[in-house]
């Protein structure tokens, strides 16, 4: 019971003391001795001769929106040229003075942060700390200037005229005596962007018994050679394009031979005439099959260049810009 009573009495005394301090100390009575805060540290005192005890020092800093500084914070301010000639309370419970140069009247000719341990009831000034300060000296704003590198870029525009001329290419089949038609496209206007051209000519020779396809790819002269031969025509691989052309030529040749050999009158006048033509064609095919083995054995002994069978040649050319 006695312990509870003593605890209540202690709390009541603390609360009463705090009310007395808050009621007796006002912000109008305070004076800031050091107007410029160094590293957030300033010295606060009362305008009257009577100064502050340790409890009043905490309350004075609080009324100004600050907090009671610690000894380490005062030492940091000392390194930034913070110097006073008055002792003041710090949060460690004793008073200190910050001195850069010795002076008999200030700190007894001492240098640095000098400590003086006294009872908390003694009255001194107070060292208050502002945690929101970012400048070394609050009176001298620090302007951070960032110099952006200036690049003097001089762009030299050089225009080179490229005259692309297509040479005349003559493609002929070794199995035909008919020369292929020549292709001479007009030279394009000069431009600053070099262009590459490919001229793909496919010569198709149609014979009665066989079809020969020859492909040539003359390359237009240019300063830069093609580094990747697998690059295709307009995004399509060259091999696929060649195969497509070969299949197309073969189909066209077979169709031509079929029309030339079997179809004599088109369209058919009536169904009876069509049946007669089909029957005649079947009889001719049977005769041709009987005579084919003998003819094939004879053709194998002959050179393809000595063939006297008539042939027709067509040339298809494609020009593409790469």
UniProtKB/Swiss-Prot annotation:
Residues 279-309 have a biased composition (Basic and acidic residues). Ligand-specific transporter trafficking between intracellular organelles (TGN) and the plasma membrane. Plays a role in autocrine regulation of cell growth mediated by growth regulators containing cell surface retention sequence binding (CRS). May act as a hyaluronan (HA) transporter, either mediating its uptake for catabolism within lymphatic endothelial cells themselves, or its transport into the lumen of afferent lymphatic vessels for subsequent re-uptake and degradation in lymph nodes. The chain crosses the membrane at residues 239-259. Disulfide bonds join 61-128, 85-106. This is Lymphatic vessel endothelial hyaluronic acid receptor 1. Residues 1-19 form the signal peptide. Gene3D superfamilies: Mannose-Binding Protein A, subunit A (3.10.100.10). One of its GO terms (cellular component) is plasma membrane. It comes from the Eukaryota. One of its GO terms (biological process) is anatomical structure morphogenesis. PROSITE patterns: LINK_2 (PS50963). The gene is LYVE1. It comes from Homo sapiens (Human). Homodimer; disulfide-linked. Interacts with PDGFB and IGFBP3. Forms a transient ternary complex with PDGFB and PDGFRB in TGN.
